[in-house]
């Protein structure tokens, strides 16, 4: 191939590379130029050059993508999951009970859990609604520690107290 034809082939190849890497639509490629170049070239050196460049790379892109897909599908997924909810819950109280508050809305494995911000209801109250808020907004207890409440539903009759620093 003459130097001028080689330079033209390189420009055509560069044009295809740029359009491909820019994710252009196939109709924007210069197909007529490629067809004309292949017809004009007696021994199809452009096509041979493309094939040689393709054969020089020993792996196909599709093979690599397939291997990554297999690795992704074979990876073991964790069975643990976390969900966050913003709830409004009502805490049932006996008239002798002296606390109420707001609970955080974090629900692990079907139970309600959150940080309690203690407040004091009216002595005559038998039920007091408490709004849930994200744990980052829950207040500190009077002793400076956060109180973690674990209950089975949104109307707790019992709670397990755990202290967090």
Swiss-Prot record:
> What cellular component GO annotations does this protein have?
protein-containing complex
Q: Which UniProt keywords apply?
A: Methyltransferase, S-adenosyl-L-methionine, Transferase
Q: Which GO terms describe its molecular function?
A: methyltransferase activity
Q: Which GO terms describe its biological process?
A: methylation
Q: What is this protein called?
A: Putative protein FAM86C1P
The answer to whether keyword Methyltransferase applies is yes
Q: What's the short name of a Pfam family annotated to this entry?
A: FAM86
Similarity comment: Belongs to the class I-like SAM-binding methyltransferase superfamily. EEF2KMT family.
Family annotation (InterPro entries): FAM86_N
User: How does this chain assemble?
Assistant: Interacts with EEF2KMT.
Task: Report the source organism.
Answer: Homo sapiens
Q: What is its EC number?
A: 2.1.1.-
